[in-house]
Design a protein with these regions (language model features):
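Histidine/acidic-residue-rich, glycine-tolerant segments that coordinate divalent metal ions
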Residues: 1-103, 192
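Metal-dependent amide/peptide-bond hydrolase catalytic core
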Residues: 66-257
Length: 257
């Protein structure tokens, strides 16, 4: 548990790029789970290296790792119930350093994301990932070591606090405040946020602020190599933080400013 038992409420903003929204629009979510959990995984596939001209004398970990990557994608379609949210992504794949050498080791890194508050979906994915990786590796005479780390829980938004936030942002911004469920249909997003740890300790609301869309030349979303943010919205984000704090303290502690 975080040492924040003295905190009564928490609020955060995340910038959002590449969306066709007016710059500075504040998106306020509904209550419940709004963002997925996230966990890192690392798979190390070990074979036997050697010269590229003599593959018969080697055990190629690249081939095994490539088949593992493909096999893992079947977890979503063949093992999760329809409607269960689970995303398994390999974002990094490394093996070898020379074009004429079969390496000893191939490695994969990635993430697992679910919106299951009890993380049973995540447990299933972890179990099957380990079994699949080790089984496929063995089929290619390799071994596979699978490890998991850095679990971050789902973001949980407090519904009464979200309703407060919508009222406060409307007071401050008028039509610049938007109910995020109009875009999401009330479904959780697949992104993750470590502020979620706070949301499991105290009532929390996590909001987004539009930081540029196609009209501003910000055509790409988060983590795209060409992503751009319109930093003219920074003052608005600061004002929103301040206004939320002032209004919440007035409503809940009778503190007037």
């Amino acid at each position: 548990a975080l040492p924040i038992s003295h905190v009564d409420a928490a609020v955060m903003f995340h910038v959002l790029a590449g969306m066709p929204l007016p710059v500075g629009t504040v998106l306020v979510p509904g209550g419940g789970i709004t963002m997925a959990s996230c966990e890192q995984y690392h798979i190390v596939v070990k074979g036997k290296g050697g010269h590229g001209s003599t593959p018969e004398n080697c055990i190629d970990p690249i081939t095994a790792a490539a088949h593992i990557h493909i096999a893992l994608q079947e977890i979503n379609s063949r093992e999760l119930k329809p409607g269960d949210f689970g995303v398994l992504t390999t974002g990094r794949f490394e093996a070898g350093a020379a074009s004429n050498v079969i390496p000893d080791v191939a490695q994969m890194w990635g993430t697992i994301r679910t919106t299951d508050p009890e993380n049973k979906t995540g447990e299933l994915i972890r179990t099957r990932m380990t079994e699949i990786a080790q089984g496929v590796a063995a089929a290619f005479r390799c071994t596979a070591e699978v490890s998991f780390a850095d679990y971050c829980p789902c973001m949980v938004v407090d519904k009464p606090l979200a309703e407060n936030a919508m009222d406060y942002m409307t007071e401050l911004l008028g039509k610049g405040a938007m109910d995020m469920t109009a875009l999401t249909g009330g479904k959780p997003g697949g992104g993750s946020e470590d502020f979620a740890f706070v949301s499991h300790e105290v009532p929390t609301v996590s909001m987004f602020i539009a930081a540029g869309g196609p009209e501003q030349g910000c055509c790409y979303g988060q983590h795209h190599p060409k992503v751009r943010f319109d930093d003219s919205i920074l003052y608005e984000g600061s004002a929103a933080f301040g206004w939320f704090a002032l209004r919440w303290l007035y409503d809940n502690a009778g503190i007037a400013f």
